Amino acid sequence: MSIHQSSDLGALPSRISDVVVPWVERSPDRPALIEASGAWTYRQLASAISETQTWLSRLGVRPGDRVMIVGENSRAFVALLLATASLDAWPVLVNARLSARELDEIRTHCGARRIFYTTSISTQAAEHAKRHGAAIEEREGCGSVGIGALNEEAVPEPLDANIADRVAALIYTSGTTGLPKGVMLTHTNLLFMAAGSVKVRTVIPDDRIYAILPMSHAVGLSVVLLASLIAGASLYLSSSFDPMSARVILERDRLTLLFGTPAIFNQLLQYAKMRKISSLKFPALRVITSSGAPLDLATKSAVEALFGMVLHNGYGLTECAPTIALTRPEAPRSDISIGPAFPGVEIQLLGSDRQPVPAGEVGELQVRGPNIMKGYYRAPEETAAVIDAEGWFNTRDLARLEDGNLFIVGRTKDLIVRRGFNVYPAEVEAVLNGHPAVVRSAVVGRTVGGDEEVVAFVQLSAEVTSTPTELADYAARSLTSYKRPSEILIVPAMPTTAAGKIAKAELKKVAESSIKEGTNGQLARRILPRQEATVEN
């Protein structure tokens, strides 16, 4: 099964930094970026980009250099990002909440010329800056910015003759299955995605968009930041997410678009439940969208009841800049489909024989279009393993297509084969998440005696209690025998990556250890100590 969504996006600028130019000419005094410490109009944003570009040049940044920007959502982060791109250097976008080990691995791999840290807005960025011995400088409108030492050994990458095909951002994947890979996204990749997002959601200059998804990740970069700037809208920056603050900001500033993850929406649900709030309705809010992780029906239904509006669903990967499919505002859905393919993107589903599967059957999802990455940095073999000679990118995700709408079934690597039958973790998770005591769950496979078992990890609500036995009985009412968990482990909080995704590789290790030590949940509590179950921005 193969399908192609047409795209008529018109001319795009050459560089991501050029998106502000039309609005400086049309509406220079329109608010562009707003944060707690102040705001920039489009005129001020353009000036900040120009001044930062000059500053970076003085600090030895050259075209083709990799420039690490360690930070969180802020005017400083945006200015550094767009100024670096305008110099034809590569912005290496790094979430400040990464560990020291993760950050240092990226620094070594990319061979950064310099590292900059948004120290005013981010405690974690300030800690990294101190650890690296960075100098601190005050920048107007940006607060304090850490400046790492110049790497004299850094060698610039050659520039592509076509500006639009040059690397506009280097984003390292969260690495839930191993070492992170550097995804090279071009100006075309990001601008195609941003412009298409504007068109699909009909974003206009009067929109006020809540930027809580980290701009160091693909969704926050293209779908939130660049799409907002292309549309001439106003972006309200938040470096972290707190349900109480979010409620105040959504109401006070009359925000119109909210992009979140299932974890963020679950926090809002828990906030409402703890305060016995049955309705969170904001008159100005017109679109709410979930992406970044699978959305289960229980969460979708609860959020829609709370907000009094449809929760849209999207799906993508960093390598695809990132959106592959999304539900449309004009065609709301009551299920958990991720909707049709993004405009201008081709999709096809292949079976194990690498041939297209019939409509309605599960296949491995392949994607082709202007959103597909240039490749993995310094990893040509890994790039060739996922992008074929015809430009098809293998997502390694399993999906089915019904009436032009995609449903993600699970990841190829996560597929559990039990008694010869396929078990898709997402299906089991959806059932468990329907229990009133469950905040979220994660299902992994465990090899035992030549077969695989289904192991479920469950995070419970602070208000409602349950037991593994009760949850097993609940799941048994909706799942056939081979899909039922062999073991259910209750955890204080799910381990997550810096992108807020559940770290299933870590859970799989716990599942294997659990059977070796013959425990019944205590091991999970010991290995996975309580942590804040929040999306790390």
What are these regions (language model features)?
Residues 252-260, 270-333, 346:
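Gly/Ser/Thr-rich phosphate-binding loop
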Residues 340-344, 353-386, 423, 466:
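Conserved ATP/PPi-binding loop(s) of AMP-dependent carboxylate-activating enzymes
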Residues 98, 117, 369, 374-375, ...:
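AMP-binding/adenylate-forming catalytic core of the ANL superfamily
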Residues 191-208, 216-257, 267, 271-275:
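Conserved AMP-binding/adenylation subdomain of ANL enzymes
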Residues 480-502, 521-536:
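AMP-binding/adenylate-forming catalytic domain of the ANL superfamily
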Residues 13-14, 28-29, 154-172, 179, ...:
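Conserved pre-ATP/AMP-binding loop-to-beta segment of ANL
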Residues 12, 38, 53-101, 422, ...:
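Conserved AMP-binding/adenylate-forming
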Residues 41-43, 168-195:
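Conserved AMP-binding A3 loop
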